[in-house]
From Swiss-Prot:
Its EC number is 2.4.2.60. This is Thiamine thiazole synthase. One of its GO terms (biological process) is mitochondrial genome maintenance. The modification 2,3-didehydroalanine (Cys) is found at residue 220. The lineage of its organism: Eukaryota, Fungi, Dikarya, Ascomycota, Pezizomycotina. Binds 1 Fe cation per subunit. Substrate binds at residues 86, 107-108, 115, 183, 222, 237, 289, 299-301. Its cofactor is Fe cation.
Length: 331
């Protein structure tokens, strides 16, 4: 049985650039949009021609908007590090609950989504244990359920989930995704009496991913920064960019050492990750598999329910501490 598709009304904000935002009407009847396209274009290709353009117009259209976004989000309310299934779920819940917050998502890869474009071992299907199907219902993502196997549901392709979630997140006017961008460090404020274990996180240090990958063979580049009173780190378990914030907390002595992710145990891991998603240092919330490196939880393997519900918990934590952290960062 598949849930009905949710009706989603995309919202838009003024761009600050002369012009208007157009939100096309979507087809409500299967095949309707295809029929309209074929009616418009079909059999007319010999006379087809795009509207004329000058190359500089394309350059200006891109750069004006990108640098406007850099300027707007230099002071953000929340920065989410990592646009995998956990980070995107966090962004969705936060942006929907608090449309007044400016939310920046920083993703090192060109393609957001992390490992959630496929299930385990490059297979297509995505398995989520109940009650994570409630998040699928919220998004309107169809899934299969088996009366003989009532404890989990299956999305036919992980990419269906991720593309749906990503499209909804990017439709919010208060969200900006900066992909192909790395977080190289954390912006900090001293704790009372200089206590490193009470340091406050007050933003992120960013750079182009291609620059970050070549610091060992290039003399450039100094980074950029984004200030925010709440940082949510969902960079996954240890890897080239994984567990970044967790490892940085150790190197700046805010925590003594990492707990080290344990072996795979789905039953133990998923509950632990969701329940313990929290603010691990003032202004820094860690969720998803990155948390396993802090606390020494088991890995969960190819089941994704804890990723999305850890994102829900991270959003709840951010809403709980936001006002206090914003006031403290302003002092």
């Amino acid at each position: 049985m598949s849930p009905p598709a949710a009706i989603f009304e995309p919202t838009v904000a003024p761009t600050g650039i002369k012009g208007k935002v157009v939100v096309p009407e979507t087809a409500t009847i299967p095949g309707d949009s295809q029929t309209k396209l074929l009616d418009h274009f079909g059999g007319k290709w010999d006379n087809f021609k795009f509207a004329p353009i000058r190359e500089s117009q394309v350059s200006r259209a891109m750069t004006r908007r990108y640098f406007q976004d850099l300027d707007r989000y230099a002071e953000s309310d929340v920065v989410i590090v990592g646009a995998g299934s956990c980070g995107l779920s966090t962004a969705y819940v936060l942006a929907k609950a608090r449309p007044d917050l400016k939310i920046a998502i920083i993703e090192a890869s060109v393609s957001p989504g992390g490992g959630a474009w496929l299930g385990g071992q490059l297979f297509s299907a995505m398995v989520m244990r109940r009650p994570a199907e409630l998040f699928l219902n919220e998004l309107g993502v169809p899934y299969e359920e088996d009366p003989d196997m009532p404890n989990y549901v299956v999305v036919k392709h992980a990419s269906l989930f991720t593309s749906t979630l990503l499209s909804k997140v990017l439709s919010f006017p208060n969200v900006k995704l900066f992909n192909a961008t790395c977080v190289e460090d954390l912006v900090t404020r001293p704790g009372p009496n200089g206590n490193a274990q009470e340091v406050q996180i007050a933003g992120v240090v960013t750079n182009w991913t291609l620059v970050t990958l070549h610091h060992d063979d290039h003399s450039c580049m100094d980074p950029n920064t984004i200030n925010a009173p709440v940082i949510i780190s969902t960079t996954g378990h240890d890897g080239p960019f994984g567990a970044f914030s967790a490892k940085r907390l150790v190197s700046m002595t805010t925590i003594d050492k990492l707990g080290g992710m344990r072996g795979l145990d789905m039953n133990s891991a998923e509950d632990a990750i969701v329940k313990n998603t929290r603010e691990v240092a003032k202004g820094l919330i860690i969720g998803g598999m990155e948390l396993s490196e802090i606390d020494g939880f088991n890995r969960m393997g190819p089941t994704f329910g804890a990723m999305v519900l850890s994102g829900v918990k991270a959003a709840e934590e951010a809403l709980r501490v936001f006002d206090d952290r914003k006031r403290e960062c302003a002092e």
